[in-house]
């Protein structure tokens, strides 16, 4: 049904970021040896990804409120794709760290915007049901990605992990084009602003609870 298709597409989009983390973990020792980097520098490639995927979600929410859901989703996936290709071609650890930060910013679109789409489409029990289906698809990534990563590394080396992740980004772009409808109306967009979002964030930060 259309309902299940939407849950599958949104779940896969949400899983792209975690997929890029979990599939990458088995590659850390090989990356250190290949690029002549110490353990701390290699672990930094993971830290900056977590940092940027968190920061990015704060940005994509209000931006998608103002311009619609699909444009920032396309932009984020395209950024993720380009950064993944850059990671696959990186020749030193500093470049890889920088590109992992950019990759996380792109992946944040897949984490934040599908949840906003669910809220646009449904409320109450229907929203909870769609979100639970989305999370079910999302939860498969931490189980399968490390196994897939280990297999890819054994066959083709650590750089191949990023090529596989880049292919996932292409599939995400295609799924967005074919399977995701714009759910934010022009009238709703007019009611949104970055200033309003910033004010809401400040209110949350001031809340002692």
Residue locations for each model-derived region?
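Small-residue-rich transmembrane alpha-helices and their cytosolic helix-loop interfaces
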Residues: 14, 46, 50, 131-139
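Residue-level signature of mid-helix packing/kink "hotspots" within the transmembrane helices
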Residues: 22, 50-58, 142-143
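Extracellular/periplasmic helix-loop-helix junction of adjacent transmembrane segments
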Residues: 27-55
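Conserved MFS/SLC helix-loop-helix module at the cytosolic interface between two early adjacent transmembrane helices
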Residues: 55-94
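A generic transmembrane-helix signature of 12-TM secondary carrier transporters
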Residues: 77, 81-84, 99-100, 166-173
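Helix-loop-helix hairpin linking two adjacent transmembrane segments in secondary transporters
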Residues: 91, 95, 133-178
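Cytoplasmic helix-loop-helix junction between adjacent transmembrane helices
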Residues: 99-138
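Juxtamembrane intracellular "pre-TM" segments in multi-pass secondary transporters
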Residues: 185-209
